[in-house]
Protein backbone atom coordinates (compact mmCIF):
# COMPACT_ATOMS: atom_id res chain seq x y z
CA UNK A 1 0.00 0.00 0.00
CA UNK A 2 2.77 2.42 0.92
CA UNK A 3 4.51 1.75 -2.40
CA UNK A 4 1.35 2.53 -4.33
CA UNK A 5 0.72 5.67 -2.27
CA UNK A 6 4.36 6.76 -2.82
CA UNK A 7 3.65 6.80 -6.55
CA UNK A 8 0.84 9.27 -5.93
CA UNK A 9 -1.84 6.62 -6.45
CA UNK A 10 -4.70 5.55 -4.24
CA UNK A 11 -4.86 1.92 -3.16
CA UNK A 12 -7.86 -0.35 -3.60
CA UNK A 13 -8.54 -3.87 -2.40
CA UNK A 14 -10.96 -6.55 -3.57
CA UNK A 15 -12.74 -8.63 -0.91
CA UNK A 16 -14.96 -11.68 -1.23
CA UNK A 17 -15.61 -12.14 2.50
CA UNK A 18 -18.74 -14.29 2.35
CA UNK A 19 -16.92 -17.24 0.80
CA UNK A 20 -14.45 -19.73 2.20
CA UNK A 21 -12.15 -22.30 0.61
CA UNK A 22 -11.83 -25.70 2.23
CA UNK A 23 -8.08 -25.28 1.74
CA UNK A 24 -7.86 -22.34 4.13
CA UNK A 25 -6.92 -21.79 7.75
CA UNK A 26 -10.38 -20.35 8.41
CA UNK A 27 -12.17 -23.47 7.16
CA UNK A 28 -9.80 -25.79 9.01
CA UNK A 29 -10.44 -23.86 12.25
CA UNK A 30 -14.21 -23.50 11.75
CA UNK A 31 -15.67 -26.00 9.25
CA UNK A 32 -19.05 -25.49 10.94
CA UNK A 33 -19.06 -21.88 9.69
CA UNK A 34 -19.54 -23.07 6.09
CA UNK A 35 -23.12 -23.66 4.99
CA UNK A 36 -23.80 -27.27 4.08
CA UNK A 37 -26.97 -29.30 4.33
CA UNK A 38 -26.28 -32.31 6.60
CA UNK A 39 -26.12 -35.63 4.80
CA UNK A 40 -25.57 -34.03 1.38
CA UNK A 41 -22.47 -33.19 -0.60
CA UNK A 42 -21.54 -29.54 -0.23
CA UNK A 43 -22.34 -27.34 -3.20
CA UNK A 44 -19.14 -25.67 -4.30
CA UNK A 45 -18.71 -22.93 -6.82
CA UNK A 46 -15.26 -21.70 -7.80
CA UNK A 47 -13.97 -24.20 -5.20
CA UNK A 48 -15.70 -22.23 -2.47
CA UNK A 49 -18.41 -22.70 0.10
CA UNK A 50 -20.51 -19.89 1.55
CA UNK A 51 -19.93 -18.73 5.10
CA UNK A 52 -23.00 -18.77 7.33
CA UNK A 53 -23.58 -15.04 7.69
CA UNK A 54 -26.58 -15.73 9.91
CA UNK A 55 -24.15 -16.62 12.72
CA UNK A 56 -23.04 -13.81 15.02
CA UNK A 57 -19.60 -15.42 15.49
CA UNK A 58 -19.04 -15.36 11.71
CA UNK A 59 -20.20 -11.74 11.54
CA UNK A 60 -17.94 -10.75 14.45
CA UNK A 61 -14.96 -12.48 12.83
CA UNK A 62 -15.44 -10.70 9.51
CA UNK A 63 -15.98 -7.32 11.16
CA UNK A 64 -12.82 -7.70 13.23
CA UNK A 65 -10.63 -8.98 10.37
CA UNK A 66 -11.79 -6.55 7.70
CA UNK A 67 -11.68 -3.55 10.04
CA UNK A 68 -8.13 -4.54 11.04
CA UNK A 69 -7.05 -4.55 7.38
CA UNK A 70 -8.74 -1.23 6.64
CA UNK A 71 -7.41 0.38 9.83
CA UNK A 72 -3.84 -0.74 9.11
CA UNK A 73 -3.37 0.79 5.67
CA UNK A 74 -4.22 3.86 3.63
CA UNK A 75 -6.94 2.20 1.56
CA UNK A 76 -9.12 4.40 -0.64
CA UNK A 77 -11.38 1.85 -2.32
CA UNK A 78 -12.94 -1.54 -1.53
CA UNK A 79 -14.70 -3.79 -4.00
CA UNK A 80 -17.00 -6.19 -2.10
CA UNK A 81 -17.72 -9.20 -4.28
CA UNK A 82 -19.78 -12.37 -4.20
CA UNK A 83 -19.25 -14.65 -7.18
CA UNK A 84 -21.67 -17.46 -6.61
CA UNK A 85 -25.25 -18.25 -5.83
CA UNK A 86 -26.10 -19.43 -2.35
CA UNK A 87 -27.22 -23.04 -2.66
CA UNK A 88 -26.69 -24.78 0.69
CA UNK A 89 -29.01 -22.62 2.75
CA UNK A 90 -28.51 -24.31 6.12
CA UNK A 91 -27.22 -23.15 9.48
CA UNK A 92 -25.77 -25.37 12.17
CA UNK A 93 -27.03 -22.77 14.66
CA UNK A 94 -30.73 -23.44 14.07
CA UNK A 95 -32.84 -26.59 14.47
CA UNK A 96 -34.26 -28.24 11.36
CA UNK A 97 -37.72 -26.75 11.85
CA UNK A 98 -36.28 -23.20 11.71
CA UNK A 99 -34.09 -23.56 8.62
CA UNK A 100 -36.58 -21.47 6.66
CA UNK A 101 -35.21 -18.46 8.56
CA UNK A 102 -31.61 -18.93 7.46
CA UNK A 103 -31.55 -16.88 4.24
CA UNK A 104 -33.31 -13.94 5.89
CA UNK A 105 -30.95 -14.13 8.85
CA UNK A 106 -28.02 -14.37 6.40
CA UNK A 107 -29.01 -11.07 4.78
CA UNK A 108 -29.56 -9.40 8.17
CA UNK A 109 -26.10 -10.61 9.20
CA UNK A 110 -24.62 -9.24 5.99
CA UNK A 111 -26.26 -5.87 6.69
CA UNK A 112 -24.78 -5.88 10.21
CA UNK A 113 -21.30 -6.62 8.86
CA UNK A 114 -21.55 -3.91 6.23
CA UNK A 115 -22.92 -1.40 8.76
CA UNK A 116 -20.06 -2.07 11.17
CA UNK A 117 -17.39 -1.83 8.46
CA UNK A 118 -18.70 0.92 6.20
CA UNK A 119 -19.82 3.23 9.00
CA UNK A 120 -16.42 2.80 10.66
CA UNK A 121 -14.69 3.84 7.42
CA UNK A 122 -16.76 6.67 5.89
CA UNK A 123 -13.81 7.94 3.82
CA UNK A 124 -13.38 4.67 1.93
CA UNK A 125 -15.29 4.21 -1.32
CA UNK A 126 -17.10 0.85 -1.26
CA UNK A 127 -18.27 -0.69 -4.51
CA UNK A 128 -20.62 -3.65 -4.65
CA UNK A 129 -20.08 -6.46 -7.09
CA UNK A 130 -21.71 -9.82 -7.70
CA UNK A 131 -21.47 -12.27 -10.56
CA UNK A 132 -24.04 -11.21 -13.13
CA UNK A 133 -25.59 -8.53 -10.92
CA UNK A 134 -27.04 -11.16 -8.60
CA UNK A 135 -27.14 -8.77 -5.68
CA UNK A 136 -28.13 -5.50 -7.29
CA UNK A 137 -31.04 -4.14 -5.30
CA UNK A 138 -32.10 -1.05 -3.38
CA UNK A 139 -30.75 -2.34 -0.05
CA UNK A 140 -27.29 -2.89 -1.50
CA UNK A 141 -27.32 0.59 -3.03
CA UNK A 142 -27.70 1.91 0.51
CA UNK A 143 -24.24 0.50 1.28
CA UNK A 144 -22.49 0.93 -2.06
CA UNK A 145 -22.64 4.27 -3.89
CA UNK A 146 -21.49 2.46 -7.01
CA UNK A 147 -21.98 -1.06 -8.26
CA UNK A 148 -20.16 -3.21 -10.80
CA UNK A 149 -23.08 -5.01 -12.40
CA UNK A 150 -21.25 -7.46 -14.64
CA UNK A 151 -17.88 -8.34 -16.12
CA UNK A 152 -19.59 -8.65 -19.51
CA UNK A 153 -18.29 -5.72 -21.55
CA UNK A 154 -19.92 -6.45 -24.90
CA UNK A 155 -21.49 -3.10 -25.93
CA UNK A 156 -24.95 -4.48 -26.77
CA UNK A 157 -25.05 -6.60 -23.61
CA UNK A 158 -23.97 -3.59 -21.52
CA UNK A 159 -26.87 -1.55 -22.91
CA UNK A 160 -29.28 -4.28 -21.82
CA UNK A 161 -27.64 -4.55 -18.40
CA UNK A 162 -27.77 -0.81 -17.79
CA UNK A 163 -31.36 -0.66 -18.99
CA UNK A 164 -32.34 -3.44 -16.58
CA UNK A 165 -30.52 -1.94 -13.62
CA UNK A 166 -32.10 1.46 -14.24
CA UNK A 167 -35.31 0.08 -12.72
CA UNK A 168 -33.71 -0.28 -9.28
List PLM regions with ranges.
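Surface-exposed amphipathic alpha-helices with a cationic face
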Residues: 1-8, 114-119
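Short, well-ordered coil/turn segments that N-cap beta-strands
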Residues: 7-11, 74-76, 121-124
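Feature marks short, surface-exposed loop/turn motifs that line or immediately flank catalytic pockets
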Residues: 19, 84-86
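Hydrophobic faces of well-ordered beta-strands that scaffold small-molecule active sites
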Residues: 11-15, 78-80, 127-128
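An active-site-proximal structural segment forming one wall of the substrate-binding cleft
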Residues: 51-81, 117
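Glycine-rich tight-turn/loop motif centered on a GG-T
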Residues: 1, 32-34, 92-106
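Glycan-recognition surfaces
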Residues: 21-60, 104-168
Amino acid sequence: VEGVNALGLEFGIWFEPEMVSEDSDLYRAHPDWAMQIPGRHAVRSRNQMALDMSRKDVQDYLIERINAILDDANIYYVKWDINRSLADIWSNELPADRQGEVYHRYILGLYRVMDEIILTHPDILFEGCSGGGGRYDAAMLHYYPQYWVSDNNHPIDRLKLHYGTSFV
